[in-house]
Regions:
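Generic cytosolic/nucleocytoplasmic N-terminal low-complexity/intrinsically disordered segments
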Residues: 12, 42, 58-61
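Short, basic/low-complexity N-terminal boundary segments at the transition from targeting/disordered tails
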Residues: 1-18
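Mixed-charge, Lys/Arg-enriched low-complexity segments
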Residues: 55-101
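Unusually extended, aromatic-enriched hydrophobic runs near protein termini
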Residues: 5-9, 26, 30, 76-81, ...
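Amphipathic, interaction-prone secondary-structure segments
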Residues: 15-50
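Low-complexity, intrinsically disordered/propeptide-like segments
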Residues: 9-12, 33, 67, 87
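Generic alpha-helical secondary structure signal
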Residues: 7, 38-41, 49, 53, ...
Length: 101
């Protein structure tokens, strides 16, 4: 999956994007990071809570993907390092089959 596809899923507020997780392949511990979308909140886009102290939330997908909250860099900045684990709580491999990627 490329950056534009994942960003578009969040920007269009697609179903089943909450609890999306990934790690950075440059991290030897492969620590998981979480992002998601919960439409019932004023700031529906979120990151962290388990990996970012006190979590982080915002109003738009653009803010989420461009915020320098991952060691001073954004998802957009670090895209080439990202390994997707799951999207919407579904393993990425299974998700690709279900969504024909």
């Amino acid at each position: 999956m490329n950056y534009e596809t994942l960003f578009d899923l969040f920007d269009r507020k697609c179903r089943n994007i909450d609890e999306t997780s990934f790690y950075f392949k440059t991290d030897p511990k492969e620590a998981e990071h979480y992002i998601g979308y919960l439409p019932q909140y004023e700031k529906p886009y979120w990151a962290g809570y388990c990996d970012i102290e006190n979590g982080w939330d915002c109003k738009t997908a653009k803010e989420l993907f461009e915020a320098p909250i991952f060691d001073g860099k954004s998802i957009k900045d670090r895209w080439d390092e990202i390994v997707l684990i799951q999207i919407g709580g579904i393993s990425f491999d299974e998700w690709k089959i279900d969504y024909c990627l």
